[in-house]
């Protein structure tokens, strides 16, 4: 009930009390290449009903993803585990901040059941930050991966994890040992914007997390993403690409930042589709196996199709 109330609140000060002191930022009108249609399809409704029936949260809803109509219409959803309330207060994010509830021991099984009901070939599992937990929720991630493997055999699993900043190294080791097919952790923005955009995180810690995941399991695909339009410049984006490649990241996503409410970080500008195409070309030139760079790209957007292409790209490179 608490989660539903939080999700349904429309007043930014109530959903994001940590941002109440911030001055309002204007929300510029979105250009034509950003606008999407309201979700109305039967597929969308069926996906929604399965998610509701299993009492699950999705980042699609909690973060206000613009692609929810398209993805849910195709029966795809990104499961968000460990509750709907985050212990961090990143200025770009629309997920509610506050004191989370205790973990639900039955959630991994319900996620697996929903994956089976939806008939997913590839599933993305993410979470809120849980700095209140000793392991940051690592074991809960591992249990969810194992439950999906048991209930939906043949489904590939992608995890989008928090940074485990306040945990020991065993947290990351626990997740990687559960053998997800893709290990994703987003850097989100250039390091110079971290104090404003991602104040509870550390750029080089996140970078090392990605590098260490690859060291623990060289066969795992690693993935990371950033938003643009936050105030970064092209040189900064290029440096992040270089840092990711040095950490062994295989798959890069770049998407346009969209401001959830006036209390959130302002949109500095809308990056044009041509600029995104230029970023994609540059990223492939730096050696990424897979790149998705469009205004509406999000971490799990077209994740299933992209995983198939990612796997094919690795095989092609190994055969070259």
Swiss-Prot record:
Biological pathway: Protein modification; protein lipoylation via endogenous pathway; protein N(6)-(lipoyl)lysine from octanoyl-[acyl-carrier-protein]: step 2/2
GO molecular-function terms, A-Z: 4 iron, 4 sulfur cluster binding; lipoate synthase activity; metal ion binding
Cellular component GO terms held in the UniProt record: cytoplasm
Leader sequence residues: none
Chief location bin: cytoplasm
Composition bias type Basic and acidic residues, residue spans: 1-29
Domain of life: Bacteria
Protein name stated in the entry: Lipoyl synthase
Source organism of this protein record: Cereibacter sphaeroides (strain ATCC 17025 / ATH 2.4.3)
